[in-house]
Amino acid sequence: MSKFSFNIYHQHKKARSGIIVTAHGEMRTPAFMPVGTRGTVKAMLPESVAETGADILLGNTYHLMLQPTAERIVQLGGLHKFMNWDKPILTDSGGFQVMSLSKLCKITEEGVSFSSHINGDKYMLTPERSTEIQYLLGSTITMAFDECTPYPATFEEAKTSMQLTTRWANRSRNAFVKREGYAQFGIIQGSVYEELREQSSKDLVELDFEGYAVGGLAVGEGQELMFKVLDYAPDFLPQNKPRYLMGVGKPADIIGAVSRGIDMFDCVIPTRSGRNGQAFTKYGTVNIRNSKYADDNKPLEHDCLCPACRNYSKAYLHHLVRIGEILGSMLMTWHNLTYFQNLMSRIRAYIKLGKDFDFDS
């Protein structure tokens, strides 16, 4: 089994490209991770997701602990076998969903108590329990339990939240079962305050995680402020470890973040947009519901190799989406995931050539 490692092969200014080696294979960086919240990427077969070029998927601890439960998944051979995906899987810690989906959640030093959004059952999620669930799932990359600081937050609010995340990170690290080829990432918090981001980074770097995530962004602060934070936040982290920007997925945001030193991304944008009839292309977004596509016999993108573009016209996709056929969601999602993987491939090629990014989609 391979050791977990991150090898940077090319660098242009702050942008890096390389390979992360894991127990479940290699992943190219910069990487975009499709979101498979409940053990599936919506409207896609796992093997179809692989065909888009994805090297890694994201799963969600909160949803999987509720249904079908981590204990059931481990009895069935782990998440990889359960969903027929043999490449790396990263699972988030569940904290963000607990705090955003549960109507009744209480944050204490111990963890977060909450009621299930499904049936109201009461649960307690702690750093130790979150780490245990991710271990049972067989996650390749486990995320430390954190509090995602809401925006806006005062300096004192952000400081209190960041310090709690640091204490939880210590507990998460102690609970993590180290195995060859597996990793745990710490999550940097501190809102939009440079002093807090620096302190959070120092505290978590001391714990020697295998990688680090920049959390608490893309929560309403806007691109300009997000980029301002990213102008300095990655510089506080080790050069030789992966950096993951959580929940960011707009093409222009990805390009801007890569140029500031970020290596990994995840977002529901390509899948959710696809199900809603929006396609991403190099020339901008296409709302396939628009009546102007009813008689358009051309593909979404002439040089895209996804099934939607190879085999079907915009008129056919328009028809499927307008009448609510499942195939419409499948083809639009397949195209969007292919577009995002093509975008990452293009980004990696520019870094290898030492070129500035001259595109934003």
From Swiss-Prot:
The keyword Glycosyltransferase applies. This is Queuine tRNA-ribosyltransferase. Binds 1 zinc ion per subunit. Zn(2+) binds at residues 304, 306, 309, 335. Belongs to the queuine tRNA-ribosyltransferase family. PANTHER family: QUEUINE TRNA-RIBOSYLTRANSFERASE (PTHR46499:SF1). Gene3D superfamilies: Queuine tRNA-ribosyltransferase-like (3.20.20.105). It catalyses: 7-aminomethyl-7-carbaguanine + guanosine(34) in tRNA = 7-aminomethyl-7-carbaguanosine(34) in tRNA + guanine. It comes from the Bacteria. Its EC number is 2.4.2.29. Keywords: Glycosyltransferase, Metal-binding, Queuosine biosynthesis, Transferase, tRNA processing, Zinc. GO terms for biological process: queuosine biosynthetic process; tRNA wobble guanine modification; tRNA-guanine transglycosylation.
